[in-house]
Amino acid sequence: MAALKHLAQVPRSTEKGMVCIQGCVTFEDVAVYFSQEEWELLDESQRLLYLDVMLENFTLITSLAHWSEAEAEDKTCAPQIRTAKEGLPTKKPHPSDICSTVLKDILHLSDLPGQKPHLTEVCTDLLDQKHHRAKNWLKKDVDSLVKNCIFHVAGNPSVCSKIGEKFPAVWNLLQPKAIPKGEKQNQIKCRKAFHSEKNNSKSDKYNKSSSPQHRLHEYPRLCSGKEGFESNSCEQDLNKYSIAPSQTDQTENRPYGCHDCGKWFGQKATLRIHQRRHTGEKPYRCGECGKSFCQSSNLSEHCRVHSGERPFECLECGKAFGCHSSLLRHQRTHTGEWPYECGDCGRLFRQIVSLITHQRTHTTEKPYECGQCEKSFSHKATLTVHQRVHTGEKPYHCEACGKSFSQSANLIKHSKIHTGEKPYKCGECGLCFRQRATLMKHQRTHTSERPYECRECGKFFKQYFYLIEHSRIHTTTEFYECGQCGKSYTQNATLIRHQRVHTGESPYKCKECGKAFEYKSRLNRHQRTHTGERPYECAKCGKFFRESYNLAEHQKIHTKAKPYNCDQCGKCFSRRADLVKHQRVHTGERPYTCGECGKTFSRTTNLVQHRRIHTGERPYECDQCGKSFSQVSTLTRHQLLHTGEKSYKCSK
């Protein structure tokens, strides 16, 4: 190992321009070679030290050859560099010649001592980089140059038979960790050119005419058999070192490459930060909540959540944000910019993350799985909200009534009940809504618009949600079948709701009267009977209704539209339910049976009235005399006795 210590023994000077080396100095004068057996005895740190010192020595030798012309004319003892190929002295060697020499030497460090370093000729145009023109080379430039040259000269030297010999142990030291074959999908076919000794003169001629603007990624073009340039080429897959043609200046401005994904960076510190994505390292931790981050800037932004600091303010509306990226996204609401478009359906988005999550609706990808019930979701936020079903967490509280919600959107909707705010008004009927989405759905009742089309069967839907539900019929291979009636569903949750019909389960209970319901929507509608809320108003007559469908049916009175016709007698009806009831007159169907006496009825209202005979219930009471009746029509006739009104007059 004494050779390692000898490597550093190169003449140096403490002042610039005071070095004087007698005679011709070549890189071989300061280089030390190991045999293959000696090289295998070195550990990784010793090999890195060897390469580091060799590059440092080469930097020193090169700097001696790049003094200014004025200094070169005045100095009495000028260093001269001899090319390793010809051994001829020259005062002003071309930078590509120097780099070619050192590349040959470094790539063959394992050659036996005393042998002439030899490498099948490489296109030295690749070595003619912009940073070669600098008078003083930096170590990182040479290091980056050598590594990039190795990556492009031989991605896998044992495969290419044109090279003539395997590259030495330095190549094994520089190359990244082994990557399983086929893991990288983006491969580039590159035709590499290597030259024999007899083509050296032609290669040199070509090198002298080369422009210093050549870059390594232009290698396939340079080695395509131009004027005065002969090449023997072979095709080779560069799985590990494939470089996109758009990555110009990678060797000039981005010399640091990631071995995991092939991405290039201009600074080594940026590469280290990037590599934390592959390793999962998060060295920056929040002292408040313990959350970790891979960058200090991300931690700084996160700390503003605890401190409440919002330094980035919108000049349009004055809204402030904790990070600059949030401000930029917000400003698109003022400019109306929607820069991200879905290639499948053409839908536009303000944020790229929204586009990515939206595209999962086309691919049916659901990467986020619940650990409790194994249900999968396409959005991480949806998974977070779903997990609150298992934990029972409801972090959003209403300040007016204290009611809690698992989602902030539900709290916002609920708060409008207390304020009575209904900012969204229908231009056709004047109906107002708390949410814009509800207004848009309502407006389709006037236009009969069905904008969402299924690409599989061509069916149209009024709401996007209905299209998503329908599309599962085509994409889902597994269906959930009811064991009682055999009905199938695309979702397990829908099957569970359906099974309540057979089991009679009613999990949603009213806190006012204790009545239970199968579905939450029915409970919400029922609660309006206690609150007296009638949110749906008719724009024609001002009448209010508890349900939107009741309003829709009522509005047909004003329009006199009767779209439902009886095919037996031709009678028309404004509601489909009325047509169904009427058709029982022709069919004689009586589907409603009394459990006490077995009497059947064609309408459920008639059955309810009949049951009062058995129960003795008289819910309709006269406010004048207190007499009670089982039917509201009987109460109406009775009240005429108190008023003296005689509404029925004989026409004769």
From Swiss-Prot:
Family that this chain belongs to: Belongs to the krueppel C2H2-type zinc-finger protein family.
Keyword Nucleus carried by entry: yes
Zinc fingers classed as C2H2-type: ranges: 256-278, 284-306, 312-334, 340-362, 368-390, 396-418, 424-446, 452-474, 480-502, 508-530, 536-558, 564-586, 592-614, 620-642
Lineage summary: Eukaryota, Metazoa, Chordata, Craniata, Vertebrata
A GO molecular function held by the record: DNA-binding transcription repressor activity
Function: Transcriptional repressor. May play a role as regulator of the ubiquitin-proteasome system and autophagy-lysosomal pathway.
GO CC terms of this entry: nucleus
Protein name: Zinc finger protein 418
